[in-house]
Amino acid sequence: MDHAEENEIPVATQKYHVERPIFSHPVLQERLHVKDKVSESIGDKLKQAFTCTPKKIRNIIYMFLPITKWLPAYKFKEYVLGDLVSGISTGVLQLPQGLAFAMLAAVPPVFGLYSSFYPVIMYCFFGTSRHISIGPFAVISLMIGGVAVRLVPDDIVIPGGVNATNGTEARDALRVKVAMSVTLLSGIIQFCLGVCRFGFVAIYLTEPLVRGFTTAAAVHVFTSMLKYLFGVKTKRYSGIFSVVYSTVAVLQNVKNLNVCSLGVGLMVFGLLLGGKEFNERFKEKLPAPIPLEFFAVVMGTGISAGFNLHESYSVDVVGTLPLGLLPPANPDTSLFHLVYVDAIAIAIVGFSVTISMAKTLANKHGYQVDGNQELIALGICNSIGSLFQTFSISCSLSRSLVQEGTGGKTQLAGCLASLMILLVILATGFLFESLPQAVLSAIVIVNLKGMFMQFSDLPFFWRTSKIELTIWLTTFVSSLFLGLDYGLITAVIIALLTVIYRTQSPSYKVLGQLPDTDVYIDIDAYEEVKEIPGIKIFQINAPIYYANSDLYSNALKRKTGVNPALIMGARRKAMRKYAKEVGNANIANAAVVKVDGEVDGENATKPEEEDDEVKYPPIVIKTTFPEELQRFMPQTENVHTIILDFTQVNFIDSVGVKTLAVMVKEYGDVGIYVYLAGCSPQVVNDLTRNRFFENPALKELLFHSIHDAVLGSHVREAMAEQEASAPPPQDDMEPNATPTTPEA
């Protein structure tokens, strides 16, 4: 303890002194009076639920249409300038991203513009976040593209003898139909989950899982964009090992790369990379980030049109952007059975990304978002949007940061951004028909930088949690090679298994006392902490249930070094030695412990089950062992009490209760008391429901705290010593009477 004596500085020590009884469970219950609770009948609850009042109607409207709450309270003078600047900044970024993410979704670019317009307007009415930017997102777009390419591959045969151009248009039309079907189904799933208040499902997508998944998605997006950057013609792959096939296909065709396309792409790539570094370095001085993507689109379009890159150098361009909005159309519901797995994955991932960013920005600005309403809002955006030929949308991380960072206060900024997209759709779309696809590819790749930076999570999780590192790596690897849909399913299963593993393999500690205090700490962690002679204090930091009850029992015996079976075996061995010495073979066959007439054995330690009810055997503590046999016993620590610290146990199931009853019985057979300390009311209720206290004496084993249990053990031992030193009573007493459990 040298470290405790070095550099000691005299300080005023604050102390507290409390005098109270030792609180066993019965003693504490005598001091407490349960409050009377007014229980409502089912009829009263139904009446209250269906009673219509103006306040209830207003709250329902506020809940399902959040705009009715914040729009009347809009502070025009304070908010309008920020929303105006933010809307313009977000809109000029949303234009190139909408065109680029349509390429990921394997649909014509104009559908990216539709997806940047309709959902944003609808989210303004139904969403609860004031700052996130709704619209196409790289990961979701890639998942949509994977389904579209799987059902409508590049080499599909279009009947009717069409030429190459018409064949491409027919293929794209089929892919749009698939994208609409997936979008509708994912929207229905999100809406139903929101109505059923299933917003909590996002908690199963832990941060390591989401970050590993989005990192793998970034690799998928990167490989998908390579062919546009190099200007090569390759087949688009989806499904298992698609990232490998796509990379190999690009490398095999690299000899056919379009130098002009690569040059334009690299020029834009360098401009964006340097410009983003400039924006980051001088963000405090700039009134708004420089809209680099918009400048890249304008520059790329100007160069392409000026030098006629498409005709002269075969550079692939965006192509025709038809003006005007398409009329509503019904998605093909007959495809649902082919895309339901993808729709579920898209619905969950889209919601997870949205609620994560929404909560981050809400915490920063001091308001709350409703996860269930966010599900409903996304469901409406996707399901109704699919009628207008949009594909699945989510929260865009980069646009959300721009919308918030440029002073956006409400979703009116998003509405303004969508109006800029509407202007392009209705009037100016033809200006961007010469935009090289390599420019859009460079824009997408540069925006993946943040996701690729997530590889830095690995050393962090290596230092902090190997389990979270395992989740990150398994999610990344499975999503990378199995595809994003099956990779996500695999990742969720792995994450749930880690939850089971954490509860099945918790940490077990033997506690000791900090001298002259009521503080009990892990004896392996601190030198000052000492074990109390004759008492073992054992702690678990998890619930006790069917998956870990046997492990808990084994850990107790291993960590404390007190195994009742070994003690019983040592006593039998001592009796045999004593019998051999005195020459009385009958002693060797005598039972060591008898419980209510039953010889100690396997049947005496198991609860009986009759008529589906568990019958626990009465617990009798054998506190004595003949002194003449002690010299034949091995020299070990004399443990008379084991205290189970239940302060970190939040529940115990029927299997755990049975295991606990067996433990109390087994240790009682060898003269060791088992006390339970710090049980929560929930654990006490679990024990009561599972009839652990069928023997009322067992309630004396429960104590309010570890210190109460320690003091109770000391009192019991002192009383036992007094009884042992007292003169024997004058009346006759049966010599082999079985002692009963003394009151603690």
From Swiss-Prot:
Residues 1-79, 126-137, 197-208, 283-291, 362-370, 407-410, 456-469, 498-744 are cytoplasmic. The chain crosses the membrane at residues 80-105, 110-125, 138-147, 179-196, 209-230, 259-282, 292-304, 338-361, 371-388, 397-406, 411-429, 437-455, 470-484, 486-497. The record marks S398 as: Controls the electromotile activity. The record marks R399 as: Contributes to anion binding. Residues 505-718 are annotated as: Extended region for STAS domain. Belongs to the SLC26A/SulP transporter (TC 2.A.53) family. This is Prestin. The lineage of its organism: Eukaryota, Metazoa, Chordata, Craniata, Vertebrata.
